[in-house]
Amino acid sequence: MEDLLVVGQIINTHGLRGEMKVMPLTEDMRRFDYLEYVILKGQKIKVEGVKYFKDKVILKLQGINSIEEAEKLKRTYLEIEREDAIELEEDEYFIVDLVGCTVVDTEGFEYGKIKDVIQTPSNDVYWVQGKKEVLVPVLKDIVLDINMDEKLITIRPSGEWQYED
């Protein structure tokens, strides 16, 4: 498992005093209210202020006090230590932990490994890459078991839920 989790990306400056506009890469952008520190380019930096504007976070970090300093950080990802992450409910996982898991069905067929998780309004979808690319809807009647220790996800055979042309 990854020790650091990406929570946002600096996309622009905000004002003249070093504030930065951040695109949140987390389901609940209000989680920034609880961050004391972020990891920026490998360094742990104290969060001095958090504001919200539309669907973006305005972040003030210690030691970044001018627009020029903030400008240099555009396109940089913000990370947090796993121990500072929100607590997940049972059967919830961080996407970074699912990527690379092997997907097999109950008949032993191996589809490949999860390349990414696509978040849709109704349910997540595993993007599985193997001999063929397969999109697996993350629904209880399709995804039967997730074993994070073995990085193995078991699903129903695709013929039971996927229609082929």
UniProtKB/Swiss-Prot annotation:
Pfam families: PRC, RimM. Keywords: Chaperone, Cytoplasm, Ribosome biogenesis, rRNA processing. It comes from the Bacteria. InterPro entries: PRC-brl_dom, PRC_barrel-like_sf, RimM, RimM_N, RimM_N_sf, Transl_B-barrel_sf. One of its GO terms (biological process) is rRNA processing. It is found in: Cytoplasm. Residues 90-161 form the PRC barrel domain. Gene3D superfamilies: PRC-barrel domain, RimM. Signal peptide: none annotated. GO terms for molecular function: ribosome binding. Its main location: cytoplasm. GO terms for cellular component: cytoplasm; ribosome. An accessory protein needed during the final step in the assembly of 30S ribosomal subunit, possibly for assembly of the head region. Essential for efficient processing of 16S rRNA. May be needed both before and after RbfA during the maturation of 16S rRNA. It has affinity for free ribosomal 30S subunits but not for 70S ribosomes. HAMAP family: Ribosome_mat_RimM. Binds ribosomal protein uS19. The PRC barrel domain binds ribosomal protein uS19. Belongs to the RimM family. This is Ribosome maturation factor RimM. It comes from Clostridium perfringens (strain SM101 / Type A).
